[in-house]
């Protein structure tokens, strides 16, 4: 018969403590990886959701496109921006750093705007939307109170 109650809890705590103490960098790496993947997914979803701005005719290929309005995430047209978003986790001497990168050449122009184009942020809102969940991930992992 399976053990239950306090015995299982103590066993779980022992395994968790061993995992964290034996390899804290690997444990922290996995928490940062989960967090960056979460933000990456939210940023991509916000772009793929579509725009609410003006709709116009595209001619190559012939189709309609609804652009994003000021202040909302950019609307996907070709999928290049979404496909350029990736995340990685790097270990340095003193830290584990998670990065979410949009490598499309125009990504920063959309995120922050230009003189002629108002910002259409997608990364910062994705981070802000997931901030409570990221805090829960690190709290559950034992790194913050």
What are these regions (language model features)?
Residues 1-145:
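Short, Lys/Arg-rich flexible segments
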